[in-house]
């Protein structure tokens, strides 16, 4: 519990600090998140999730996964949430 409280306190402190004071930390967080998002393992996970969603939609509408991949995004999401 103390670690969570300390973490929240630090985050709130960083939010209320002037950008010049907290800029380096936020820049580091932003650059690290960007590097992680563009890393190979994350790309593989995103592709796996996309393929699983395509297969699920294809199964629901009775089409092939490639046909499900060609659907407009709105229709695709509507089918996922039905």
UniProtKB/Swiss-Prot annotation:
Tissues and organs where the protein is expressed, per its UniProt entry: Expressed by the venom gland.
Keyword Disulfide bond among UniProt keywords: no
Coiled coil stretches, renumbered: none
UniProt-listed GO biological process terms: defense response to bacterium; defense response to fungus; hemolysis in another organism; monoatomic ion transport
Signal sequence annotation: 1-22
Source species: Opistophthalmus carinatus
Family stated for the protein in its record: Belongs to the non-disulfide-bridged peptide (NDBP) superfamily. Long chain multifunctional peptide (group 2) family.
Protein's cellular compartments: Secreted; Target cell membrane
Maturation-removed propeptide residues: 67-82
CC annotations in GO: extracellular region; membrane; other organism cell membrane
Protein name: Opistoporin-1
